[in-house]
Swiss-Prot record:
Annotated compartments: Cellular thylakoid membrane
Catalyzed reaction equations: a plastoquinone + NADH + (n+1) H(+)(in) = a plastoquinol + NAD(+) + n H(+)(out); a plastoquinone + NADPH + (n+1) H(+)(in) = a plastoquinol + NADP(+) + n H(+)(out)
Gene: ndhI
Family: Belongs to the complex I 23 kDa subunit family.
Name of the protein this chain belongs to: NAD(P)H-quinone oxidoreductase subunit I
GO terms under biological process: photosynthesis, light reaction
Principal location: membrane
UniProt keyword annotation of Nucleotidyltransferase present: no
Taxonomic placement: Bacteria, Bacillati, Cyanobacteriota, Cyanophyceae, Synechococcales
Assembly mode: NDH-1 is composed of at least 11 different subunits.
HAMAP family: NDH1_NuoI
Superkingdom: Bacteria
Amino acid sequence: MTFLKRVGEYVSDAFKAAKYIGQGMGVVFDHMNRRPVTVQYPFEKLIPSERFRGRIHFEFDKCIACEICVRVCPIDLPVVDWVYNTELKKKELYSYSIDFGVCIFCANCVEFCPTNCLSVTEDYELATYDRHELNYHQVALGRLPSKVTEDPMVTPLREFAYLPKGVIDPHDLPTGSQRAGKRPEEILAEMRAAKAAEAKEDKTAAEQSN
C-alpha cells in the first residue's frame, strides 16, 4: 500500500508540474504575439505624455516668497529662504531649493503658485550616485531640460500605452502623429459635442411628448 501510495503521489505531482509548466508556456506564447515592451536606453528614450510630471522648473525673478508651495506640499519639501526689505516693506527671496530625492512629484506647488514661477518639465533623468546631488537649488532648478526629440543621438519613442490605433511598433510612428493621450482642446471638443448631442436628444424627446 505504501508503494502504491507513493506512486499515486508521484503521478499527481507530475500532473501538477505539467499543468504549471503549461500555464507558464501559455504566458510566454501569449507575449510572443505582442509588441515589445523594452527600450534600448540610452540610445532610445520614451517621449513623455502631455501630462507627465517630471522635474520642477523654477523662475527666480517671478517668486514672491509667499511660501504657498511649502504649505500645499504634502511633505513640506520646498525650502524658501527670504529676507524682509524694510525700505520696500516686502519679502525678498534669498534662496530656493527642492530635494528630488524626497519629492513625490504631485505638482501641488505648481498648481497653487500665484505667480507661475514653478512648472513641471519632461525631465525624468535624475539618477545620481550621491543622493545629496538631488537637492536642487534655484540655479539648477532654473535650467531647462533638453527634449528627447532634439537629441540627434537618441531615437525618441512614444509611450507604448499611447500609441495610435493600428500602430504596434513605436519605431514606425507616422510623421505628424499626436504624441500621447488627448490634448486639452480635443477633450473640450468631445465634451461640447456630447453636450450638444444630449441637448438635441432632450429637444427631440420634448417635441415627441408634445
